[in-house]
Amino acid sequence: MSYDSLMVFTGTANPKLAHDVVKYLNINLGRANVGRFSDGEVMVEILENVRGNDVFVLQSTCTPTNDSLMEILVIVDALKRASASRVTAAIPYFGYARQDRRTRSARVPITAKVVANMLTSVGVDRVLTMDLHSDQIQGFFDIPVDNVYGMPILLGDIWKHDYQNLIVVSPDVGGVVRARHLAKRLECDLAIIDKRRPKPNESKVMNIIGDVRGRTCVIIDDMVDTANTLCEAASALKREGAASVIAYSTHAVLSGKAVERVQTSDLDKLVVTDTIPLREDASKCNRIHQLSVASLLGESMLRISNESSLSSLFIE
């Protein structure tokens, strides 16, 4: 593929991110009419020639999740029927990813696999995503999946602020690998919060493994949803004598009363990226700060289109 053939289209989920990405690429955003019929069905019309082009559909499957997902599927179908040479679904925040396995023989779906099947069925040739909730989701696809990492963006902000007496904290055992990687890059200590989760979207902090007294604690996670876990973790760290608690998370889901919880919690600052657009109350919250991943996504798209290495973006 040549650079001249690269095109980017988007739906209604995160148009600002799409505009920032094409600005980085120095191209125009693909023209398409994405709307609704009178009964609420998704309506799509591609308004320019895409025949033979390398096309990316940039859309996070964030709230409204089902509409965002349906828009991707319908846009991809329209592009394939218009003879696009290759269509990559660029999904920075991959929704439905938290149900990635059956637990204890429960009668539940594996929604991450369902979404993978849906994307494949409409003719997606490749998937580009960022900080998947679990890496094994890549194996649910029979097409190439590029899962890029927001760590360089988050790490750059940490270096910029030059926090003193730093310690990286994993909010749970499942996030230890991510936290250990960050601690290695920062050449600092690692702490782990041991917790028990009595029911979905609720967690109880039980124990902190590591000495956080007098330290600047940086919590790292892939997403912040209800912020229950995050705020409880901040309180536990402060009780153990932490000087300050700063959280870094790629995906700002921030559902329900999450923003209110953050504002009234022991958390000093929450830093997120723009894979998901911030709600109005989150934008006004002085404890929530947003970084852009547009350059990282744009460079990833360019390298995919040019058949260049993506992994070299993340080599230490």
From Swiss-Prot:
GO terms for molecular function: ATP binding; kinase activity; magnesium ion binding; ribose phosphate diphosphokinase activity. CDD domains: PRTases_typeI. It is an enzyme of class 2 (transferase). D-ribose 5-phosphate binds at residues 197, 221, 225-229. Its EC number is 2.7.6.1. The active site is at residue 195. One of its GO terms (biological process) is purine nucleotide biosynthetic process. Pathway: Metabolic intermediate biosynthesis; 5-phospho-alpha-D-ribose 1-diphosphate biosynthesis; 5-phospho-alpha-D-ribose 1-diphosphate from D-ribose 5-phosphate (route I): step 1/1. SUPFAM superfamilies: PRTase-like. NCBIfam families: PRK01259.1 (NF002320), ribP_PPkin (TIGR01251). This is Ribose-phosphate pyrophosphokinase.
